[in-house]
């Protein structure tokens, strides 16, 4: 249903270090890299970070990234923390969302909330 998502960020390279680490753990790669934007994906660019233009603040703050399993959730969470992210909920079961819903939460360098989930 969603073709792509983009976040406006205050420092493109700082945010790229964070997303490079998280996406590497999920098997996702950079597909586009310009002065103003970086896009990640598997077969097509689906997740964009864009250098903030005239907006007064970075964009919307939550996206859920699909992982292949619990180990990938753990690895992405660890990688994000090592790349400047802030823990916003350690990996674990979230029964309020479903019996097998396993997720970890991070805040990226701009404070945008990133969930990594396996179901």
Regions found by a protein language model. Name each.
Residues 113:
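Glycine-rich acetyl-CoA-binding "A-motif" of GNAT/NAT acetyltransferases
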Residues 11-13, 65-110:
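Vicinal oxygen chelate
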Residues 35-37, 60, 101:
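A generic structural signal for beta-strand entry/edge sites
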Residues 40-75, 79-82:
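Long, continuous compositionally biased terminal/linker segments
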